[in-house]
């Protein structure tokens, strides 16, 4: 089904003459004011599923443009693959019924009509949508069918290395683990309530939905871009320090490439499809494709192993189901740190798996997510577990907390072992962050080989590793963690190294603005992001605004501070909702404190004008 959506001051049409395909109609036409007009072509293969998705697409646009009236206008000129008249009329009536929560008008099918329309001309006033049914439905069903063939057995591996059936485990004291287990077993991914981080990302002017793009695509304001860039730089550096070689690969690939086609047939997924001049391409949903093709044309010997390559994909694309998309948690375009390790044998693969597990713990901890902030899941085939029981049990020693084990009766996926660190948010939804998999299939599929010490070519094992998970999801986890801080009576905040403004200097009056600017400049020379609230507002409002922005350090400057050389500094991390922690310190002491908290982290300068009076508002 093809849709052309026009937000109009008015739409009027007049019925002239019927065709042999016309549905019964005894009116002359109508005029509708303040209306979203949906010019609609019903295509071959469209069904009730397509109608529901079309209604959802129309509803989404109507809500964005605040339209209360919708006109469905049959328009054959949007497609060359039209459904028959009987089907078209039936589905158009169903579309009308699906949108019954609006005031709906439907122009008759099969009549020659004259029409006039006045398009409003704003950025969302002219949009098109192409609604597919069969392909996505087939992919979704294929995924479900394959998943249903694999039988899962659920256990908890205790710190004492006892494997306990989930039903028999005592979750007392492990409430987050209980929520995670329930979420995993229920497999209910749809979002019914907006999670707290969505309000935070908007209020802090970090990010927001882009209404002119597809669902699940985000725009980042200067503050959000800074946070995201710092995370990208930090994660990339950790992978390179670990020994990975950074590469870059294309974002789209030929759907009919022999190797890639076999992979997509084996593991169907929801992809964006791009039509080229002569070929169809799919947008990557991971860096695997490009990195594996690169490795397949490389000369590798046992001396090179373990070999690690890394790419930060900006972006990877996956057409997640619309009902699962929300904020930064689940997107259709996302930034994924993707490292692949080539290992000569299973022993080397297990060693790397263990090391990358520890690396992932370290990366999340340095970002600002402690082990108590997430739950661990290990997914494994029964055969691999039986053969490597001691190794699997050793994983619990790293964090010394119970972990969820999903054990499959046989292998369907390309891996035999996988771990995930999952963040459970305020709505009890779980999202995977760090993950590592041992892949036993793709080296052969892609023709990746290495020359062993005996001179023979062999297929290696491959580890897939994302030490943090998608960067957007890390931001989501940090913001959701802030909500938990609020629930505990603390003040929500980002880690100091990620805070867009680390220190705000507030003059008590206009007379002290110049002094505040000088102090801010002195602090900023130490590689610290400092701004000055020079607005003509009361001191109380300036302090409240700084608190609303989660500024880690708020320094007030007045006569007393200038004379003493000591600033009155509010320390957010040590404050509570009931009491503000205020200390006196010099500008040098403040700079040293901030610098020590950010040691070893990347730095970027302030992304906005230093003076608040010069800043635009992105809300």
Curated annotation (Swiss-Prot):
PROSITE patterns: AA_TRNA_LIGASE_II (PS50862). It is found in: Cytoplasm. Binds 1 zinc ion per subunit. Zn(2+) binds at residues 288, 340, 464. Pfam families: HGTP_anticodon, tRNA-synt_2b, tRNA-Thr_ED. Residues 196-495 are annotated as: Catalytic. The keyword RNA-binding applies. GO terms for molecular function: ATP binding; threonine-tRNA ligase activity; tRNA binding; zinc ion binding. Its EC number is 6.1.1.3. GO terms for biological process: threonyl-tRNA aminoacylation. Its cofactor is Zn(2+). It catalyses: tRNA(Thr) + L-threonine + ATP = L-threonyl-tRNA(Thr) + AMP + diphosphate + H(+). It comes from the Archaea. Keywords: Aminoacyl-tRNA synthetase, ATP-binding, Cytoplasm, Ligase, Metal-binding, Nucleotide-binding, Protein biosynthesis, RNA-binding, tRNA-binding, Zinc. Coiled coil: none annotated. Not inhibited by 1 uM borrelidin (BN); probably does not bind BN. Its main location: cytoplasm. One of its GO terms (cellular component) is cytoplasm. InterPro entries: aa-tRNA-synt_IIb (IPR002314), aa-tRNA-synth_II (IPR006195), aa-tRNA-synth_II/BPL/LPL (IPR045864), Anticodon-bd (IPR004154), Anticodon-bd_dom_sf (IPR036621), DTD-like_sf (IPR023509), Thr-tRNA-ligase_IIa (IPR002320), Threonyl-tRNA_syn_edit_dom_arc (IPR015011). NCBIfam families: PRK03991.1, thrS. The N-terminal domain is an archaea-specific tRNA-editing domain that hydrolyzes incorrectly charged L-seryl-tRNA(Thr). Catalysis of tRNA editing is performed by the charged tRNA itself. Homodimer. Belongs to the class-II aminoacyl-tRNA synthetase family. This is Threonine--tRNA ligase. The lineage of its organism: Archaea, Methanobacteriati, Methanobacteriota, Archaeoglobi, Archaeoglobales.
């Amino acid at each position: 089904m093809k849709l052309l959506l026009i937000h109009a001051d008015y739409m009027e049409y007049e019925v002239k003459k019927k065709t042999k395909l016309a549905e019964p109609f005894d009116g002359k036409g109508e005029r509708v004011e303040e209306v979203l007009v949906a010019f609609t072509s019903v295509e071959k293969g469209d069904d009730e599923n397509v109608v529901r998705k079309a209604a959802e697409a129309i509803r989404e646009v109507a809500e964005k443009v605040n339209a209360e009236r919708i006109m469905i206008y049959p328009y054959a000129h949007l497609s060359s693959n039209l459904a028959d008249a009987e089907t078209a009329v039936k589905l158009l009536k169903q579309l009308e019924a699906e949108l019954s929560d609006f005031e709906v008008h439907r122009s008759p099918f099969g009549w020659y009509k004259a029409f006039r329309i006045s398009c409003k001309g704003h950025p969302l006033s002219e949009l098109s949508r192409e609604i597919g049914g069969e392909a996505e439905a087939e992919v979704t069903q294929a995924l479900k069918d394959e998943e249903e063939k694999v039988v899962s057995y659920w256990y908890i591996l205790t710190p004492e290395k006892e494997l306990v059936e989930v039903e028999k485990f005592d979750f007392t004291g492990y409430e987050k683990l209980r929520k995670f287990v329930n979420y995993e077993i229920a497999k209910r991914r749809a979002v019914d309530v907006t999670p707290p981080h969505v309000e935070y990302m908007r209020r802090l002017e970090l990010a927001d939905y882009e209404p002119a793009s597809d669902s699940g695509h985000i725009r980042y304001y200067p503050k959000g871009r800074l946070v995201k860039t710092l995370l990208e730089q930090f994660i990339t550096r950790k992978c390179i320090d670990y020994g990975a070689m950074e590469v870059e690969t294309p974002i789209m690939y030929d759907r009919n490439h022999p190797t890639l086609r076999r992979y997509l047939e084996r593991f169907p997924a929801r992809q964006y499809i791009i039509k080229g001049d002569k070929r169809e391409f799919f947008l990557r949903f991971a860096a695997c494709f490009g990195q594996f093709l690169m490795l397949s044309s490389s000369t590798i010997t046992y001396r090179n192993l373990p070999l690690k390559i890394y790419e930060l994909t900006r972006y990877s694309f996956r057409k997640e189901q619309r009902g699962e998309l929300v904020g930064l948690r689940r997107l259709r375009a996302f930034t994924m740190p993707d490292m692949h390790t080539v290992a000569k044998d299973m022993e080397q693969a297990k060693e790397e798996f263990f090391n990358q597990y520890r690396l992932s713990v370290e990366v999340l901890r340095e970002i600002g997510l402690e082990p108590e902030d997430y739950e661990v899941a290990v997914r494994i085939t029964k055969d691999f577990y039986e053969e490597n029981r001691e190794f699997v049990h050793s994983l619990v020693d790293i964090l010394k907390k119970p972990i969820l084990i999903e054990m499959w009766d046989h292998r369907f996926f390309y891996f035999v072992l996988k771990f995930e660190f999952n963040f459970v948010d305020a709505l009890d939804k779980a999202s995977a962050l760090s993950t590592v998999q041992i892949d036993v299939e793709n080296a052969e599929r892609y023709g990746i080989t290495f020359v062993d010490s005996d001179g023979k070519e062999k297929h290696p094992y491959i580890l897939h590793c994302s030490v943090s998970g998608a960067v957007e999801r890390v931001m989501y986890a940090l913001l959701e963690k802030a909500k938990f801080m609020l629930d505990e009576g603390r003040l929500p905040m980002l880690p100091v190294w990620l805070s867009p403004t680390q220190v705000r200097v507030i003059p008590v009056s206009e007379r002290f603005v110049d002094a505040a600017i000088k102090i801010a400049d002195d602090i900023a020379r130490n590689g610290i992001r400092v701004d000055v609230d020079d607005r003509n507002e009361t001191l109380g409002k300036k302090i409240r605004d700084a608190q609303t922005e989660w500024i880690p350090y708020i320094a007030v400057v007045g006569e007393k501070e200038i004379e003493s050389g000591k600033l009155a500094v509010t320390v957010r991390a040590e404050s509570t909702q009931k009491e503000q922690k205020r200390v006196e310190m010099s500008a040098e002491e403040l700079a040293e404190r901030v610098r020590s908290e950010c040691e070893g982290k990347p730095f970027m300068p302030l992304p906005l004008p230093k003076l608040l009076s010069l800043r635009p508002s992105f809300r």
